[in-house]
Amino acid sequence: MLIFAWLLTFSAPGAGLEAVSSAELCGDCHRAIHETWKASRHAHAMDSRLFQDVLHWTEADLGAAARRTCLGCHAPLALEIGDLTLQKKVSWEGVTCDYCHSVREVFMAAPNPKAKLKFDRMKTGPWKEADPGKHGAIFSDVHTSSQICAPCHEYRNALGFPVLTTFSEWKASRYAKEGRPCQSCHMPRVEHGGAARLVGATLLGAERHRQCEFCHAASAAGDVVEQRARRSSAAKSNLRDMVNLHEMKGSHSIEQLTSAIKAQLEAAREGNKLKVTVAVANVAAGHYVPTGSPLRQLVLEIRADTGGGKHFREERVYRRTVVDQQAKPVEREHIAFVKGVTAISDTRLAPDEKRSETFLFDVPPGDQTEIKAIFWYYYSPLATTESQKRVTFLTLSRLVQ
């Protein structure tokens, strides 16, 4: 009999559809934030093709009850309003504004972190001086810390297996000791105008956005709170100069991956062998790489192509290998969430970890060889398109005589 540990949030009694707000309402005033959020993985946590496929397989393999485990983090408001069949538009907004900004506390007690929610006109956030105008605001220490992320990025299943460990990976790293929460990398702060410029450059491309900004730069300062809302609250307080970006860039971002993983490629002759060495390091991720779903992988692929027509291929794979109660390797995410019992190996890169990978190829002297080291991030075996399955983010090359 399977037991599902899905209660990652709890709210005050009486939460219903009338108590929650759509992100579109928030976007009336918080335009730039809304635009960046709409392009984020949080906004598409529910409607992504990959998640839809996984949800289908979850119900087919594990029954309808398992659906709640998935929706708890991919459509949290659906659980709050009891819309398990996803009939309401707000249920399709993924991790939406009114979820995160209704969190009042996060309880870290075992087995899983839980968020306490309260849906009303008072919205929680990381700014003591916030005065949005249309609704009340409460400063929340939780929103300045990594704890706000923990209920969905730390999860132990009913069998005791730690399926998601991103929060605890961060907690054990120097980033936690230095007071650098998840937001410092995934929700960096910019000036008011900087948010508008980033939105424009993201949606239009940098060159087209510069053309727009030539005339519209004067209005950029009003990007975070829409001008009429800004004017209504200007007499009450001086609005802050900084705002957290809501793109929440992570492993689907080439920028984040290339920032986190650095590598050097060397090649030298050793008799009739060609020795290839790749130094690889996790230099900027405050958690393991990869993190999140236990089936994700970081793959280093080495290609050696000789002038004589020989082609060599080798790989190093950085991953967790999860097994079920029959010691059978788990090959689907939803099975890992429910039936995973242990990781029999873990070759991922810890924060600040450096490794040297060595490869030997049978290439005689004088046979010119092109060496390539290709890093790609593998997301899911259930992905139906190549872009959902993996992304190549770093390629190094060297020509050896």
Predicted regions and their residues:
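Bacterial N-terminal signal peptides
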Residues: 1-9
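Sequence context of c-type cytochrome heme-c attachment sites
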Residues: 8-177, 187, 198-200
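Short, conserved sequence motifs used for protein processing/export or organelle targeting and
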Residues: 157, 189-401
